[in-house]
Design a protein with these regions (language model features):
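N-terminal alpha/beta PP-like core and its mobile active-site loop of ThDP/TPP-dependent enzymes
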Residues: 1-132
Length: 132
């Protein structure tokens, strides 16, 4: 099983019904196949605002979930994720991954260390086995 498939399976099992995203993330096809509705935004910050708004409207009973492209996509969503964290709005943020050989290579934005200060938890998933 691939990481994107494992993520989709876990999201479905946890009751996620839709995911807000900027197109062409590795998770898009996997969540669609799992029966999770993808809601596409035209910019990463907009997708984050949609996920944040969803969480707020449901009073935190349902968590807004967002996925964006690696590097610049995660960087574009940064301010929105920080705002949700500051306001204690529960948002699950799943930035796309990059080739392990390129991870942390300048000028790429490395999401994990940057998001540690503005999220409850941030880590990198390297294999599907690490999810179980």
């Amino acid at each position: 099983m691939r990481v994107d498939q494992a993520i989709a399976e876990i999201l479905k099992r946890e009751g996620v019904e839709q995911i807000f995203l900027f197109p062409f993330t590795p998770i898009l096809e996997a969540v669609s196949a799992a029966g999770i509705r993808p809601i596409v935004a035209r910019q990463e910050r907009v997708a984050e605002n949609m996920a944040d708004g969803f969480s707020r409207v449901s009073n935190g009973k349902k968590i807004g979930t967002i996925t964006v492209q690696q590097a610049a996509g995660a960087e574009n969503a940064f301010a929105g994720i920080a705002q949700a964290y500051t306001d204690s709005s529960p948002v699950l943020f799943l930035p796309g991954g990059m080739n392990r050989m390129e991870s942390g290579t300048p000028p790429s934005f490395n999401a994990v260390p940057n998001f540690r200060a503005t999220t409850k938890w941030a880590d990198q998933l390297l294999t599907a086995d690490s999810l179980t």
